[in-house]
Amino acid sequence: MDSIMEPYVADLLADDITASMVELLPGDGGAAQMDVGVLDAYLRAIGALPAHPAAPGADLAAAAEVESMASNDDTNGVLYDWDTKVDVKVPCALLPPPPGFPPLPVPGLADEPVYAAPARHLPPPPGFPPLPVPGLADEPVYAAPARRLPPPPGFPPLPVPAKAEPVYAAPVDEGDAIRAFMQQLEWSEQYNGDNDAPAPDNSTASRPQLCAPYDDDIDANLRDMEKDAAQRPSPDYLDTVQGGQISAAARASLVAWMGRLTHRYELAAGTLHRAVSYFDRFLSVRALPSYTAHQLSLVAATAVYTAAKYEDQGTVFKLDAREIASYGEFASAQEVLAMEREMMAALGYRLGGPNAETFVEHFTRYSKGKEELRVQRLACHVADRSLESYGCLGYLPSMVAAAAISIARWTLNPPGALPWSSELQELTGYSSQDISSCILTVLNTQ
């Protein structure tokens, strides 16, 4: 080794830089005292000589050295790199195993945690049969009615009750229902004509002072007003005055729109009936300049506006022309006011005529009790729906009200009540035969 190193040592000592470092080496600083092994390691460290080949088992030694330098987090696979001064994540499975130990398996699907598998999927212990695969039989027993469980030993099985179909599930033909109603109405006429028939609970005998003197005057006044031709619309004005430009379906749509307007501003109950009366009476005497949706809506909205003024005592919100113009998307409030002046002139300033809602309240003014009040409310609703029927213009408002009351009684069918009674005939002045055709007209609009 000395013979090999001597030429290199001589060259290095001749170099000025190396000569200045001789004093840093162990010994007296002379070449004779220099440790050749130390110099060899130094030369190989600075790259002057090639590195020694790796000895057998060097990997294990390097791994042991790295493991010895690991930080406190080496149990989590985090090692400390002394060169970069940072922690390096090294999976423990990638480190070489100690001598005499097999290498660790690479993690895969088979190494997933066992908690993800239900216990019944694990193999059974030795000597035990495997658990059955879950299915319908493993559903909780509370989902099955008790009658489906097997009976105890010695007891016969419980009989399964027959499935009862609900009554409302069967569809009812409207024609059959109307025919049944008319038959019951005819039967009530025969029943009321029987002199031996007992008087119902709501008969005139149970109501003292039913026909007081002022009641007769009020009734006579209402009857005269409803027959006044100046306060009634023409039953065929769509053809005779408007020339067929407005259909019955278009009129029904406008009436429904007027109903939404009255509900939007919570107007009084009689506002809609009075507004529809103004609408029909105006179109019965004035042909429109145009039949656009804007023009028809303007007439309908103005009728509601005028009726709301008449029924202002029962109105929550006071309407003005600006509200009507905003709801109907008209040009301005002046357009509504101009139509109002034209409508008032066409109506002859006669705004207080009776309508069907007026007569429903008049005929049921003595109603008392829960069932009779229900009949009264439903009769008012039926009268509201009858406004959409163009055919109802051919009947007096009192007859439409009587038909609505009969339909309400038949629909609710209170105990002991018939579609028509002798008391109702006395109050309204109509027999069941008188209102039969009006009932059919009203039912066709429901």
Curated annotation (Swiss-Prot):
Which parts of this chain are annotated as the region Disordered? 191-216
Signal peptide range equals none
Q: What keyword terms does UniProt attach to this protein?
A: Cell cycle, Cell division, Cyclin
Matching entries from Gene3D superfamilies are given as: Cyclin-like
Keyword Transcription regulation found:
no
The Swiss-Prot or TrEMBL record describes its family as follows: Belongs to the cyclin family. Cyclin F subfamily.
Tell me the protein's name. Cyclin-F2-2
What is this organism's lineage? Answer: Eukaryota, Viridiplantae, Streptophyta, Embryophyta, Tracheophyta
